[in-house]
Each structure stands twice: as structure tokens, then as C-alpha cells.
Amino acid sequence: MTRTLKPLILNTGALALTLILIYTGISAHDKLTWLMEVTPVIIVVPLLLATDRRYPLTPLLYTLIFLHAIILMVGGQYTYAKVPVGFEVQEWLGLSRNPYDKLGHFFQGLVPALVAREILVRGMYVRGRKMVAFLVCCVALAISAMYELIEWWAALAMGQGADDFLGTQGDQWDTQSDMFCALLGALTTVIFLARFHCRQLRRFGLITG
């Protein structure tokens, strides 16, 4: 199957993420929280490198995964409630809490939705754009819900030690707003990125028609 990115670009991106991973790990506020936050990056990056020839993804998806990985690693470094740029946005918008975690949950909907869309469209598993859009949003929300369950299990297992990982900042509706942000990310995929995504799929011969 034709590669969608030159090996140099893909390997450079992977190297950059590896260096950021090492740096954020060394300077992490809490090593256990950092490890819990960056585990998806540790799993996904080697997987993408291993499947580059057999199942290359669109450049759009590679780019968004790259950005999401950085968001996760920065969140793990400082903990989401203490990311400096989040405090700047909080002050600028007059918010009551650091909103950086909401950016993370937005990408938690955006990226899985695009992954699901790419798999469904390329495999021709579903007919009809509306059904694809519906299933893509369902997948993103399911992943978001699973993450909230993981946070709950962490809270049960670690008690107050899980506070940095949970990052609720005293918000009683944190779980619901997290999932809403993930839904907004998924809707961004199906409303604003779908057409461009299809153009890339056709351009690289990943779909026909």
C-alpha cells in the first residue's frame, strides 16, 4: 500500500514526540500521574510506526495524533489543572478554573472520531454519510466514557493520590463537561473535517469514487 507520508517525516515526528516524552517525564510534577497520562502515547506511536507500510493513515490523521500526543504529554508534565498556558487562558477569559483539560477532552473526541471515520470509510463497513457520522460520534463518546470510568477506578484505588490525575478542580460537573467537550471534538470531525478527510483518502488511493 502507498505510504501517505515520507518515512523521514514520520520518523522525525516520532523522534520529536520521543524527545518531548523524555523531557516531560524528567520534569514531571508527579511521575505516576505523568505515566498514567502519557500511556496512550507510549502505546500508539510505536504502533503507528509498525503499521506505516501495511496500513498508512492520512496526513490529516497523523497530524492530529501528533498534536494530541503533545497535549497529553504537557498535561502529564504539569498535571492538567496546573498547565501554565491554561492559567493564561483562564485569566484572559475570566474563567473559574484552568481549562487546559477541556482542550485535552476536545481532542479526545476529535482524534478517535477521525480514526473511526478512516476505518469505517476505508473498509466500506457502513453505507451512507449520516450513518458514518452517527457511528463516529458514538465511538468517540464511548472512548470518552471509558476514560471517565478509568478515572473513577483510579480514584477508588488511589484515593486522594488520584487528585492530580482526575483534575476536577472542584467542579461537580467535570465528568459531564469532559464528555461534552469530547462530543464537540467528534462533531468537529464530522462537520468540518469530513470533506477534507475524504479528499485525502482519494488522493492517496485509500478509497475509490
Where are these regions (language model features)?
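Interfacial helix-loop-helix junctions of multi-pass membrane proteins
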Residues: D30-W34, V85-G86, Y100, S144, ...
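N-terminal membrane topogenic signal
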Residues: M1-L15
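"…centered on the first transmembrane helix and the immediately adjacent amphipathic helix/loop
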Residues: A16-L110, L114
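Hydrophobic alpha-helical membrane-insertion segments
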Residues: T63-L72, V136-Y147
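Membrane-interfacial alpha-helical segments at the cytosolic side of multi-pass membrane proteins
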Residues: I43-D52, F107-M124, A157-Q160, F180-F196
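Membrane-interfacial segments
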Residues: D52-Y55, V83, I119-G128, A154, ...
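Residue-level signature of transmembrane alpha-helical entry/exit and packing/kink sites
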Residues: L10-G13, E37, L61, K102, ...
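Internal alpha-helical transmembrane segments of multi-pass membrane proteins
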Residues: M124-L141
